[in-house]
A protein has these predicted regions:
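An N-terminal assembly and electron-transfer interface module characteristic of large anaerobic redox
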Residues: 1-362
Length: 362
């Protein structure tokens, strides 16, 4: 099998390392680009959300690189993500692509089906080899998330933001040529060392902004037009409310009870939203309140057009903003989103928060 998977931020790094440790040939999709989105938009139903369209673009670009198997997680609940594999398989079939799609559905969708699909990936490896590969993959997920947050912190204080750009660009370029989880971990360690050596201005007192909303648009830089970088260039310290590590700890490592961190967000959201609405709608509301309690200066909700769970959360956040006296901005993205207008809104929001801080200090 030549396995590929859709992009979701840095998840592809851990997925690549895990599959290579199991002896598979991995076809990493090209980094998401305008071309990826155009391909996906061309063949996807018009009203499907942007992540769906980017996924289709990822698949087609990977198939053209030689991939014959697609690995994707499933879902359940009101979010349409759970229907992705079915619809996407039909689209690829109609386009004449003969590929096998392996879906890791939630345990609640059927343990036998999940076991069958997992066994396809495990490649008849021994329990010891599987444990070792899984442990390395988990370490990769955590370390890539930590590296991403470190780059956000350094960028907010850096004397020259380009220094951070060069280090991170070099890191992503080297990933394609690096094989195996252990080598990828070494690359991450060296990149961390380089970031910590970037000259910083300790006198900067950056604004702190939380990024909340739909998980794909939070995590995938192309989908959110590199919002972390844009805010960092404005001397803003950014933190994401959802990362692959947070998702994994809540839905897998702490199953079926959930992680303490995410359950706390559910508790905070209860006064506004008692029941889950699909996706991460309830977490979005809870995260806004959580960031307020931690002394953040504001939050930005980001979601793809037509995302049902986040539309519900968006309507509630207006009340949260008023009740908590806490700046909240919502950004909706799709294939028509223009970067100039997007950046203008970010700059205006940051100016607003800066004036608010100055007024409080004064």
């Amino acid at each position: 099998m030549k396995i590929t998977f859709p992009h979701l931020g840095n998840v592809y790094i851990a997925c690549k390392g895990f599959l290579e440790e199991l002896g598979h040939e991995v076809v990493t999709p090209p980094i998401c680009s305008r071309k990826t989105l155009e391909i996906g938009s061309k063949y996807s139903p018009e009203m499907m959300c942007m992540p769906f369209k980017i996924f289709i673009g990822n698949y087609i670009e990977s198939i053209e690189k030689g991939a014959d198997t697609i690995l994707i997680t499933g879902s359940c609940g009101p979010c349409r993500f759970g229907l992705y594999p079915i619809i996407q398989a039909d689209i690829l079939k109609r386009l004449g692509y003969d590929v096998d799609i392996i879906v890791f559905d939630a345990i609640g969708e059927g343990i036998d089906k999940l076991r069958t699909n997992v066994n396809k990936i495990l490649n008849s490896k021994s329990s010891q080899e599987i444990y070792r590969s899984s442990k390395l993959a988990l370490s990769l997920i955590r370390r890539t998330d930590d590296l991403s947050q470190l780059s956000n912190e350094v960028r907010a204080y850096a004397l020259n933001k380009i220094d951070v750009d060069k280090i991170m660009n070099n890191y992503y370029l080297n990933i394609e040529q690096t094989h195996g989880a252990e080598e990828l971990l070494k690359l991450i360690k060296n990149t961390e060392i380089d970031l910590r050596e970037v000259p910083i201005d300790k006198n900067i007192n950056p604004l702190k902004i939380g990024i909340i909303g739909e998980i794909y648009t939070i995590i995938e830089p192309f989908a959110n037009l590199e919002i972390e970088k844009k805010l960092g260039d404005l001397n803003v310290l950014v933190e994401k409310s959802l990362t692959p590590t947070i998702w994994l700890e809540h839905h897998v490592l702490s199953y079926p009870f959930g992680s303490k961190h995410e359950n706390m967000k559910h508790k905070l959201a209860e006064q506004y939203l008692k029941n889950p609405v699909g996706g991460h709608g309830r977490e979005t509301v809870g995260s806004a309140i959580y960031y307020k309690s931690r002394g953040f200066d504001g939050v930005i909700q980001i979601l793809p057009l037509n995302c049902m769970p986040e539309i519900v959360a968006k309507s509630i956040l207006k009340t949260v903003e008023k009740d908590e006296d806490f700046p909240i901005m919502t950004l909706v993205v799709d294939e028509m989103t223009g970067e100039a207008g997007y950046l203008t809104r970010l700059e205006a929001f940051i100016d607003l928060i800066n004036k608010r801080r100055e007024k409080c200090i004064g």
